[in-house]
Structure formats: C-alpha cells, structure tokens
Curated annotation (Swiss-Prot):
Gene3D superfamilies given in the database record: 5' to 3' exonuclease, C-terminal subdomain (1.10.150.20), GIY-YIG endonuclease (3.40.1440.10), UVR domain (4.10.860.10), UvrC, RNAse H endonuclease domain (3.30.420.340)
Subcellular location: Cytoplasm
Annotated GO CC locations: cytoplasm; excinuclease repair complex
Name of the featured protein: UvrABC system protein C
The keyword Cytoplasm is annotated on this UniProt entry: yes
DNA damage is among the record's keywords: yes
Length: 616
C-alpha cells in the first residue's frame, strides 16, 4: 500500500501520527484532535501527492521526505498530547524540537513537621503541607545551601538531633545544640526564617558571604576564603537580577523562549509570594535541521511546558506568563487542568509589571544565546557530528562495554557523558549482570535492556560501542527495530595476526560508523587527533567501570564457590549450576525442584540449606 492509499484510511479520531522516510527512519511525531484532518493538511493530492503549499520551510522539507505514515488512536485530545510527549522523548524524531538535556532540576526544601527543621536538596517531590520547596535550580542549589549553612547556625546534619551530646559543630559555633536543649523550638524557628530570607534574597546572601570571605582572608584562612569566593561566583551566575516586586502574594511561573543562529534556549522563572525566587534554563535541540528554518515557537513552548508540568510540581502557580502569543493556549490550559485538577491560565502580557518580568526572561534568553554563540571555536561535538555524519550534536553520550573471565561474573557497563556538566555523569552510570555467553549476545542483551528503560530515561544523542563493525550493525538493528532515532559509532583495536591487542603501542584504535547512504565505514585517526582521544576517553571509562564491577562480582562468586566447596559441592557441580542459572543470585533463589534438574537430590538439598541460612 503506497502513502496516498494509506492516507485515505485515516480515521476521524484523536490520536498521534508518525512520519517515516524511505529507510524507515522516524521523521516526526505529531498529535491531532481529528487525525484525518490534521495529517491530510500536510499534503496536496493533485495532480500527485506532494507537500501542501502553505507549510513552513522546515515542515515542507520534512513532508518531501515522507514515505510512510503510522498512527495510534486515543480516546481524546488530552491523551494524544500526553502520548505525543512521551513518544518524542523516547524516540527523538529528526524534525521535532527537543530539549537538549531532558532532566529534572533540584529543589531546596524544609520540612516544618520536624522539631528542628533543616534545609536540604531533593529532586523528588512529596505531597505534604508541612514541606516548603524552593526552586527548581539549574545551577547553584548546592552552593546556595552550603553558603546558608556557613552563615546560619542550623542543625548541620540529620543525625545531630538524634544525639544527646553537642558535637564539633557546636564548638565551632555552626550549630546551637538543640540535642542538649540549648535552644528552644520557638527560638530555632526564628533561625529557620532567617535562613529562608537568604533564599528569597540572594543579593543579601552574597553580601553576607563577601563579609565572611573578607573575615577569613583577614584571619589568613585563605583556603576557606577561596571556597566562599567560588560559591559567590556560582550563585551570582545563577541569579537573574530583578528588583520587580508585584506587591501581591501571587505565585507565577514565567516561560520565555528565543532563538538565533540555529540555537534556541528556554528560560523559566518562578515568582513566589510576588518575588523572584529561582530560575532555570535549557537549550533546545534544533541543530539537526539541515537549513536555516523559521523557528517554530508553538512547538517549542508546547514541548517546554508539557515536559516541565508532566512532573510532580511542589507549588502550582496561579498563572503562567509566556513571552509569545500561542495558538495552542487552550490545549495547554486543558492539559494543565486535567493534570492537576486546577485551572491555570496561560497569559502573554502586553503591559505593566508582568510584561516587564517577561522581558527580563527574554533578555536572559538573549544573554544565554550571546554566550553560547561567542564560543567561536568549533566544539568537539561539532567535529564529531561532521566526521561521523551524525544527525545531531552529541551532547549526551552513552558508552557500553562488557567484561567477564572465562564466562564467569559476566557484566555489562554503561557510562554517560553530559555536555552540560562537561564531564561524566556518574549518577547516570549503570551496570548489568548478563546471562549471555558470547560477546555478541552480551552486547545485544545489554542494549535491549537499555532500550527498555527509554520511557524512564530517554535516549541519548549518541551511543559508543566498544567493538567492531559487527557490534555496530547489531546496535543499529536493535534501535531501528524499535524506531528510535539514535546515532551510533563503535571503537575497536586494529587487529594484528587476527587478534585485537589492548596493550598500548600494540595497535591503533579504529572507529566504525554508518554513512548517510547506509554504508559502514571506518576511520584510522592519528593518535594525536582530539576526536579520537575524546572517543577513547569514553571507551576507557566504560572499560574501567565494567572491569571494576566485574572484579566485585567475581570476588563475590569466588567467596560463594569456596563456601560451597566446604559444604561438599565440587567445582564441576558449581560450573554446571552457573551454566544453567547464569549467576549465583538465581541459584540462591532457585527452588528445590529447579536445583534437582541440575544436581542430585542430596546436593540440591545441601545448596538449598546453604543459601537459606547464608548471611553476607
């Protein structure tokens, strides 16, 4: 069935549609109140099927590449909106606007249910009337919190109030020892209110920190003074300067988006009780468009607002101010009402103080774009994109390796490089216990398990596989089977005498990639090439992480083997068990009948008794 015939079958229902090119690559995901009307509006059908005349240049180019269309029917437009957002985050279509780094930002919070409340940081929101949240913060949250503890004598650690004796923090005058009842709850509450003032007023916090820094310097405590200096810089960098006070107690969120030079940024500002308390920003991914297209503000705001409010929000605003007029305002308000059972208005103010606030957000967009565009030198990400024909700049990279010893303690590792951190994101590292016996199957098992988690942790921009062309083809087959738009390269040692030598100096690294025409090619770059060195750094970190986890698992296995041998279970029987179950954790959970399929009843009983009574 050709595309024109397929389009004639579109239903009159709400749903989500997907466009694919001639190679089956996903181009675009959209939603519709009536699929038939929306999808057909992209095309004109006479004299032959072609893009409609009134499309924007970006969408016109996309439609000219469309070879097939699929759709999913849902009960209503709201469900279509939610499904569209979920699929875009997971599948990363070429022509959709995406957040460069789709992450959850931290909040500072205080729980007033505690007798002596502390300030702390979290990314998880609990629904509780006793907890007050401040944020979110894209930068500076930890520095701000540490600074407040530096100048306000709050309870320093959770364990402090559980003790019965004043600790070192009391001796150095950083805590007032509520553990010894040296301060009442009422007096301590005033200290907490003082601490919160510094969150509301960062200028006051910075002024106090400068006083403290000067004091440290005069006391020749230069290391502590330098620490405060660095904190001040981070807090200043994160602060949007504004003297605007709405003179009301309104809670308002502000979203502003601007774009130029194939870069786009969103700034979010949060007013609580009429005062600006925090802000965050994200760059949008539009670098994968081949030409300078007119930026689609409608889609950008839709992505930004749905992505943000699809999470748990500690304090819902009365209204959301936006910097541009939107045609989809009613749809977004309906989404917010359904999501939170609360009416939240989206307003594009034209005058007065609310317009001033929106203009501040737009000015900060311009400043962030200016800084981004001032990075004149070609970045490593741009060089990698050009060299390997990547669809997008690889700001978020996942690298994979596996490790085992003679088939024992087989593990896989995934490490993550994040451009916004300019280093490895070790909190995002993952390791896998693998059951497969050969390297090809092990990599397949690991990549499939990673793809299964895309709904929770969306796909990165680039995968780096530790292996050759065979594993690269495997990875492409896997991602294409689920329709994910994802660039992949592989790095392997050059083979000498049919062996790949890892030792330095023995062989060079070869990078394998796939061209736009679907051909698999390779580069043998000079060892001094910074593009090679960057990819090697990713591979080496994945290898280190895999080896470290393998050694840990191997030690645990060796311990189990030794103890089982003491119980009379020989090495040959242990190998049979591992061959059948794959790992000790599964042997430990096996039933008597399952163990009997491998060993005799006596040995099965011995093993069952051993693991029933075993303590780590």
């Amino acid at each position: 069935m050709n595309l024109q015939e397929k389009l004639q079958q579109l239903p009159n229902d709400a749903g989500v549609y997907q466009y694919f090119d001639k190679n089956g690559h996903l181009l675009y995901i959209g939603k519709a109140k009536i699929l038939k009307n929306r999808v057909k509006s992209y095309f004109k059908f006479t004299p032959k099927l072609q893009p409609a005349d009134k499309l924007s240049p970006r969408i016109y180019k996309m439609i000219s590449e469309v070879e097939s269309c699929e759709w999913i029917v849902v009960p209503n437009e709201h469900d279509a909106l939610i499904l569209e957002n979920s699929l875009i985050k997971q599948l990363k279509p070429k022509y959709n606007i995406l957040l460069r780094d789709d992450k959850t930002y931290p909040y500072i919070f205080v729980d007033f249910d505690e007798d002596f409340p502390r300030l702390d940081i979290t990314r998880r929101i609990q629904k509780s009337k006793s907890i007050k949240y401040f944020g979110p913060y894209s930068t500076g949250a930890r520095d701000m919190l540490d600074s407040i503890y530096e100048i306000v004598p709050l309870v320093q650690k959770k364990s402090c109030v559980k003790g019965k004796k004043a600790c070192l923090f009391y001796q150095i005058q950083k805590c007032l020892a509520p553990c010894e009842n040296k301060i009442s709850k009422e007096e301590y509450a005033k200290i907490v209110e003082n601490a919160l003032e510094y969150i509301y007023n960062k200028t006051k916090l910075i002024s106090k920190l400068n006083e403290k820094m000067l004091q440290y310097s005069n006391d020749f405590r230069f290391e502590e003074a330098m620490t405060l200096r660095d904190r001040i810089k981070t807090i200043e960098k994160s602060q949007i300067k504004s003297d605007i006070d709405l003179a009301t107690n309104e809670d308002i969120d502000i979203f502003a988006i601007n774009a130029n030079n194939k870069k786009a940024v969103i700034v979010r500002m949060f007013l609580r009780d009429g005062k600006l308390t925090s802000s965050s920003h994200d760059f949008l991914k539009i670098d994968n468009f081949d030409e300078e297209f007119e930026f689609d503000y409608q889609e950008a705001y839709e992505r930004a607002i749905i992505n943000y409010y699809d999470n748990e929000i500690p304090l819902l605003p009365k209204e959301i101010l936006i910097a541009h007029e939107l045609e989809i305002t009613n749809e977004l308000e309906e989404f917010l009402h359904t999501r939170f059972n609360k009416k939240i208005k989206l307003i594009n103010p034209k005058k007065d103080k609310k317009r001033e606030i929106v203009n501040i957000a737009l000015n900060n967009c311009d400043e962030l774009l200016r800084i981004e565009n001032s990075k004149n030198q070609t970045s490593i990400y741009e060089e990698l994109k050009e060299l390997f024909n990547l669809q997008t700049l690889p700001y978020l990279i996942e690298s994979f390796d596996n490790s085992h010893m003679m088939g024992q303690a087989t593990v896989g590792a995934m490490i993550v490089w994040n451009e916004s951190l300019n280093t490895f994101d070790k909190k995002a590292f993952r390791h896998y216990n693998l059951e497969s016996k050969d390297e090809y199957s092990q990599m397949k098992e690991m990549l499939i398990r990673r793809i299964e988690s895309f709904e929770k942790n969306p796909a990165p921009d680039l995968w780096i596989i530790d292996g050759g062309e065979t594993l690269l083809k495997l990875a492409f087959d896997i991602v294409q089977s689920v329709g994910v738009n994802l660039d992949i390269i592989a790095i392997a040692k050059e083979k000498i005498d049919a062996k790949a030598h890892r030792a330095k100096g023995k062989a060079k690294d070869i990078i394998h990639y796939k061209t736009k025409n679907g051909e698999f090619k390779s580069f043998n770059l000079l060892t001094s090439d910074k593009r090679l060195q960057f990819v090697q750094r990713q591979r080496d970190e994945a290898h280190r992480f895999a080896i470290t986890f393998h050694k840990k698992q191997k030690r645990a296995q060796d311990k189990q083997i030794s103890l089982l041998q003491i119980k009379g279970i020989g090495e040959a029987k242990i190998k049979k068990l591992l061959l059948y179950f794959g790992e000790f954790e599964k042997i430990k959970k096996a039933s008597f009948d399952e163990l009997k399929t491998v060993l005799n009843e006596k040995d099965a009983s011995t093993i069952l008794d051993y693991f029933t009574n075993f303590k780590d």
